[in-house]
Amino acid sequence: MSQSPIELKGSSFTLSVIHLHDSRPEVIRQALQEKVDQAPAFLKNAPVVINVATLPNGANWKDLQQAVTSAGLRIVGISGCQDERQKRAIARAGLPLLSEGKGQKMAPEPVVSPPENVPTKTRIINTPVRSGQQIYARNCDLIVISSVSAGAELIADGNIHIYGMMRGRALAGASGDAQCQIFCTHLGAELVSIAGQYWLSDQIPSDYFGQAARLHLLDNALTIQPLN
């Protein structure tokens, strides 16, 4: 029996979500361009989701689409849209609408207690992480016992530990766990992110550059402190 020419498989990806609070295309374009210029290696040609939950009706979707793409970003979908007229306008502009799975109320599943004494998996990297490399620790913590070059990317659903110079990007809590943290012995990252809350390099306090630091969320905002 010959193999099918295609195969559909479920998967998951880490995408940046841009929340629009203004419907003026030029204002959006300038704001996005500033972000892209701050971290071109991370954001240039990056796939993004546009969240329109707080955007007023009546936006020109063709112009907004052009504003986002002209800043060097690629729209893969629109989320947060609840208004039917707005949905039709977005569809006419050729933009895909994404469902965030909150529309239907499901009966709660019974809580199952986890088995005791089950060790938490951890992915350990013992070699340097080079520019262009991406390492993803699915459903576990990530430990890197070496340096991370600029242009490299670390992603973990759990915590991230870097025992070396960190010049790349670190995204902890990628599946949305706001309790995750980032620990680094020599912080010089292009970007740090926990559960979608992120700082670009120029937002990291300069006092911590090259220093040992711990990052976590406090009241849904990134915070940093010395790692002793």
UniProtKB/Swiss-Prot annotation:
Keywords: Cell cycle, Cell division, Septation
Pfam family membership, one: MinC_C
Cited Gene3D superfamilies: 2.160.20.70, 3.30.70.260
GO biological process per UniProt: cell morphogenesis; division septum assembly; regulation of cell division; regulation of cell septum assembly
PANTHER family: SEPTUM SITE-DETERMINING PROTEIN MINC (PTHR34108:SF1)
Family as reported in the entry's similarity comment: Belongs to the MinC family.
Function: Cell division inhibitor that blocks the formation of polar Z ring septums. Rapidly oscillates between the poles of the cell to destabilize FtsZ filaments that have formed before they mature into polar Z rings. Prevents FtsZ polymerization.
HAMAP family documented for this protein: MinC
Quaternary structure, from the entry: Interacts with MinD and FtsZ.
Protein name (database record): Probable septum site-determining protein MinC
Protein's gene: minC
